[in-house]
Curated annotation (Swiss-Prot):
Pfam families: CAP. It comes from Triatoma infestans (Assassin bug). Salivary gland (at protein level). This is Salivary antigen-5. SUPFAM superfamilies: PR-1-like.
Amino acid sequence: MAKAHSSLVFCLLALALVRFAQAKCTNGYTFLGIKELSEKDKQKLLDFHNKFRELTAAGEAPAPKGEDGRERRQPPAANMLELTWHKKAEKQAYKWARTCEWKHNNATDKAGNSMGQNLGRKMSTEKTDVDDTFDKWSYDLVRGWFDEAKLYKYGSGFSMSTGHYTQVVWANTSQVGCGYSYYMQIDEYNQKWYTGYLVCNYSPAGNFNNREPYEISKEKCTDPKLESSKNYKHLCVLKKKKKN
């Protein structure tokens, strides 16, 4: 019995080592870990996104200051959906985060439609691990995307400087899935940077040219296909079809 148990432990350890060896950065950086998201982790990322969507839908998200220097707010949204978790989006984000590549890839849904994608990274000269940095940095990374609202003027169209924000609050985006990795890179001054890398994929994609991220209205969920979310006062969900 003890021998069988020892063999099982050895096999599991060998499998873990093989998986780690296969998970290499494709750009020469040193791979240090990939986050295996628990249900709690997924809910945390969902909550970050939905709370920022709620702020925008409520008309409380920051906007560029006016000419008089006063604070401004983004207009409220009529039809912004509450996000749910997308397993396929998560799987693709996981695979891309594992490459450590700081560029977009073409994530697609089951139908082959392109998904939206946000990338974020945070760096430190202090080495820790993937779980610790995810816990400490994941909120800051999503918040960094949302903070682009301070640069976004509603109706101005797509901009590279505000595209993370507009994807986060794109009204008819209904699902998100993310992946997170941790790696080390060395800069031109031979300084080691330990980097947390968050990839989030969105379905359906946002950031279409000549379209606004949402409709402006103080009235909520007026579309007959929508009803109010039970979790967020200013967000909507699709009505469930009644069974015959």
